[in-house]
């Protein structure tokens, strides 16, 4: 498998959307052959980010659902829409990559029909959103073909979500992810931090 698209999402919260320039530059330097897709939960691209418009996909906010929730959960469903038939890697808006080999080497010999979870730290009840990769058709196989809005409304109706980092419902995306992943009967690979030599610097 190869990394074909790097996908993340954000709403208009400056705590996250202000990472757009750094995110694009960092990934373009590390994996220049990959496409970058930033799903922006908004009606229009702010002027400050128009230089990066080629990498931004607008998703109009769905009324009645917190935009932070939409930005978190859309990373599970939007990969189905990617046209490029290579791996779609999802990540956080405020996570900047530092080592190319961490992303490319562990998946080099993994078949394209496999869903790969890079980190085993949250299992079994959750799956960390950083990092996971699969081909678009595999994403669809795991998360179904129902519309993004239908999925959002169903999930949102079943949780209490306050939009605060670490607050009520904040891990909904990771909990739902784990539920779908465990129920899926296709080939899976869960990587080990000790083998991939995972390391991060926190801001």
Language-model segments: what does each one mean?
Residues 74-118:
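GT-A fold catalytic core of metal-dependent nucleotide-sugar glycosyltransferases
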Residues 1-64:
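N-terminal anchoring/stem segment of glycosyltransferases
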Residues 40-45, 95, 121-122:
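Short beta-alpha junction loops
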Residues 112-136:
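Short beta-strand-to-loop element that shapes/binds the nucleotide-sugar donor at the catalytic cleft/hinge
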Residues 17-25, 101-104, 145-151, 173-175:
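Well-ordered, non-membrane alpha-helical segments in soluble/globular domains
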Residues 84-85, 129-144:
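Conserved nucleotide-sugar donor-binding
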